């Protein structure tokens, strides 16, 4: 599963974005937050973060995005469980403030998280150093424990399937245009790399269902 995590100082806009997603967002979990609105929850988080002046980038934000596949669709409950367990691996405790939102405006749902690194006792529980790498490792470990495919496994399977389909298409096509058509029929888009000096310099092949026309931001 694709994932990202970073530490930063946020404004209320981050929570508002996570809680909106063009009207499709669903808040699926919160912890140590009394308010229902993004703006008030930000004020709660900021008040707790201010208890530890040494922590400047007090928010841990990011997302987990499962593979875009109808047959591999996972439930909201499983996605929440996966996220909470991965967050626990990088230092999140029952005393941290957490908000999780599931977004549905893109081709496949994904979950966003905002966590206060400063817990309700004023202690920083999450180390910023290599947090993206550590969170990715945590997600892969939890995926294996929950019998879910990791991002590495999915990437390998997709590459093997693409090469198999490319071999089939090369056997049928007699020119490049036919190759593009054959691959398109199998669900792939062939994108040429071109420049003025050398013309076509290469190509890349992407699964059409993986092309995301929306710009996803944390």
Task: Report residues per predicted region.
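N-terminal nicking endonuclease/strand-transfer module with a His-rich metal-binding environment
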Residues: 1-218
């Amino acid at each position: 599963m694709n994932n990202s995590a970073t530490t930063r100082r946020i404004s209320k806009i981050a929570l508002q974005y996570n809680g909106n997603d063009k009207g499709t967002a669903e808040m699926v979990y919160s912890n140590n937050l009394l308010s229902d609105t993004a703006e008030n929850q930000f004020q709660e988080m900021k008040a707790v973060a201010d208890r530890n002046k040494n922590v400047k980038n007090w928010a841990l934000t990011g997302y987990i995005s499962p593979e875009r596949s109808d047959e591999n669709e996972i439930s909201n409950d499983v996605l929440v469980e996966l996220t909470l367990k991965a967050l626990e691996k990088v230092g999140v405790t029952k005393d941290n403030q957490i908000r999780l939102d599931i977004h549905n405006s893109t081709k496949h749902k994904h979950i966003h998280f905002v966590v206060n690194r400063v817990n309700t006792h004023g202690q920083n529980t999450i180390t910023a150093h290599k947090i993206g790498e550590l969170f990715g490792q945590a997600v892969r470990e939890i995926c294996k424990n929950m019998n879910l495919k990791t991002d590495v496994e999915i990437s390998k399977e997709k590459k093997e399937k693409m090469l198999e389909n490319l071999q089939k298409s090369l056997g049928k096509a007699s020119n490049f245009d036919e190759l593009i058509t054959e691959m398109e029929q199998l669900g792939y888009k062939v994108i040429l790399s071109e420049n003025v000096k050398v013309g076509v310099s290469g190509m890349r092949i992407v699964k059409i269902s993986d092309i995301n026309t929306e710009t996803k931001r944390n």
